């Protein structure tokens, strides 16, 4: 995937940040947030707009991005008062990532390995991902780097995901760009392929949401 102009501008802003903890990311993130707001406006009011013809608009290919975007930039917490003022659910000190540590897996292959274990291989037979999107916490979990101990073996990874970190996790799939008739005809194939217990199927605007757990 070739980075869009907006994505490249975001990556350039990240790369230009000074090194060291406590760097304010607001000015870096705000232009991208403003652009997302504009894309949402176009989606609601002008769907024929040329910007929306690119299926990757608003996205960043994190696996093809430089290391700057994959590196932790820590906030500086002065004291307990500062912590309580800025965080609703503060992370314990021993769980906070250190400055300069990786904030995501190193490459796509590592993500795929984590995803296969997290989903217990339930999507391994889904060969055609056209109009199917996996999103939500399950994807973020597989993007997050694991400690050496937690990734020592497939058994260790499985134990971490399903016993320690995400014991009640689920996998969210979204179907897009399909008519109701196409969705109806696609579901039997998808449900046969995805060997999961389906918890919920619902429509969200122009997409269909299938939620299940392994």
List where the protein language model places each region.
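Catalytic cores of the polymerase beta-like nucleotidyltransferase superfamily
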Residues: 1-214
């Amino acid at each position: 995937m070739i980075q869009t102009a907006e994505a490249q501008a975001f990556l350039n802003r990240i790369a230009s940040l000074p090194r060291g903890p406590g760097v304010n990311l607001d000015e870096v993130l705000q232009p991208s947030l403003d652009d997302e707001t504009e894309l949402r406006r176009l989606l609601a009011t002008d769907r024929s707009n040329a910007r929306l013809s690119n299926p990757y608009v608003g996205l960043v290919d994190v696996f093809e991005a430089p290391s700057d975007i994959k590196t932790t930039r820590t906030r500086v917490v002065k004291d307990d008062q500062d912590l309580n003022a800025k965080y609703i659910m503060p992370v314990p000190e021993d769980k906070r990532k250190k400055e300069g540590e990786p904030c995501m897996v190193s490459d796509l292959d590592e993500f795929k390995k984590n995803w296969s274990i997290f989903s217990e291989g339930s999507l391994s037979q889904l060969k055609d991902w056209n109009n199917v999107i996996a999103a939500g916490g399950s994807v973020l979990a597989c993007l997050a780097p694991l400690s050496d101990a937690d990734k020592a073996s497939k058994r260790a990874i499985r134990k971490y995901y399903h016993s320690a970190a995400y014991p009640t996790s689920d996998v969210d799939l979204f179907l897009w760009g399909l008519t109701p008739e196409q969705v109806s005809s696609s579901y039997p194939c998808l449900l046969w392929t995805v060997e999961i217990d389906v918890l919920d199927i619902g429509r969200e605007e122009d997409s269909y949401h299938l939620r299940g757990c392994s």
